[in-house]
Amino acid sequence: MCYNTAMAQLICKDLILGYESKIIIKKLSFAVNAGDYLCIVGENGSGKTTLMKTILGLLKPISGTVETGEGLLPDEIGYLPQQTFVQKDFPASVWEIVLSGCQSRCGCRPFYKKEEKKLAMQNMQKMGIAHLARRCYRELSGGQQQRVLLARALCATQKMLLLDEPVSALDPGAQEEMYTLIEKLHKSGITVIMISHDIDASLRFATHVLHIGKEIFYGTKDEFVHKSTCPDCNGQIRKIFGRKI
């Protein structure tokens, strides 16, 4: 697996990931450059979310390292986790949730500065939810809730976003809206790393693909389409393109 670390924002070296004595990912190495749109795909239970939590420092690898570069600090990564029922019923206002994304900027301060409140409002406007500021989060639709959480993630960074299944449980219309928003953020210069079960969407939007399974593949989207030797990858690509790979 070849990769260039010279201009990388994120470098994962020889990662072995798992829980207790069970290893789920072995010897994974890849690098993400500024401006990349990396989609992480694979079967359920293959370790995609474990990898993302390791990148964020929420889990420790069994071995290997995760490093940042190009001026990216570990606390400058915005994170949109998979939604849970607890999150969906969270009894807070949209404004409170989005503003909480600025907490990493506060340090020991028990209050938000004017600049942080301005940033929160700007990100709400960017996501088209400024008019929902005083609404209770749990009263919103699934698509609106995801926009709120994406605005919150943007308060932490203008450099890199990590998104874990950002369109899961959304209806097709809301999925397309979310993909469009994420693509606009990518075009504005933000590096995107997204877990997705949808290889079709990955091939529409990604610059690079990381497939985790019995075989691991990392490369550009074109390399994934034309050179991947993963049997389960090829089956899904054939469905999309209607031809043998």
Predicted regions and their residues:
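Conserved ABC ATPase "signature" region
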Residues: 114-132
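Conserved ABC ATPase signature
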Residues: 136-140, 144
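H-loop/switch region of ABC-family ATPase nucleotide-binding domains
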Residues: 196-197
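Catalytic Walker B motif of ABC-type/P-loop ATPase nucleotide-binding domains
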Residues: 161-164
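H-loop (His-switch) and adjacent beta-strand-loop-beta switch element
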Residues: 209-222
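Helix N-cap at the start of a conserved alpha-helix in ABC-type nucleotide-binding domains
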Residues: 172-174
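Conserved ABC transporter NBD signature motif
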Residues: 64-77
